[in-house]
Amino acid sequence: LGAAEVKISLIAVGKLKEDYWKKAIADYEKRLKPFCDFEITEITEGKSLKEEAQNIKKKLKGCVIVFDIHGHMTTSEEFAEIFSLNMNRGVSAFSLVIGGSEGLDEELKKAADYRISFGKVTYPHRLMRVIAVEQIYRAMTIINNLTYHK
């Protein structure tokens, strides 16, 4: 699948306000352009995780990956492999979900194709966006045999 054919959506609960996070994400968004059509969708924090999950579900397309501290501890190579295996099967859309400060609804996590964790530490959900976008970029460079990942 070519860059124009792969769509990656990062769906995140809450609004990103800080310019320093926005700048970091913008840098990786620019770097991702040769590899995919990338977008971030912000979901308003709901009164409950169930309400947030309903709003998230409306945005999900293709392969669904949720970030969950209790998910499979994933290396950068394994994360890249998720994309690679699915793209080789013809999957062209990926939805990656980051919960808000209260996490994600359990049913939403169970329904995902992948539940992954980048470690046992808890990250602020705003920082997790930067980490996720960087790891998506890293995954694309691994798949394309570029030297970014060492």
Model-predicted segments: where are they?
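N-terminal beta1-alpha1 ligand-phosphate binding loop
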Residues: 5-28, 32
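Conserved RecA-like P-loop NTPase ATPase core
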Residues: 10, 65, 99, 132
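Hydrophobic/aromatic beta-strand patches that form the interior of the parallel beta-sheet core
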Residues: 11, 41, 65, 114-116
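Short glycine-rich anion-binding loops that position phosphate/pyrophosphate groups of nucleotides
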Residues: 16, 69-72, 100-103
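Conserved strand-to-helix beginnings and helix N-cap segments that scaffold or border functional pockets
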Residues: 21-25, 53, 76-80, 109, ...
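S-adenosyl-L-methionine/SAH cofactor-binding core of RNA-modifying enzymes
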Residues: 35-94
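Short glycine-rich, acidic/polar surface loops and turns
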Residues: 94-107
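Structured adenosyl-cofactor binding patch, chiefly the S-adenosyl-L-methionine
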Residues: 106-150
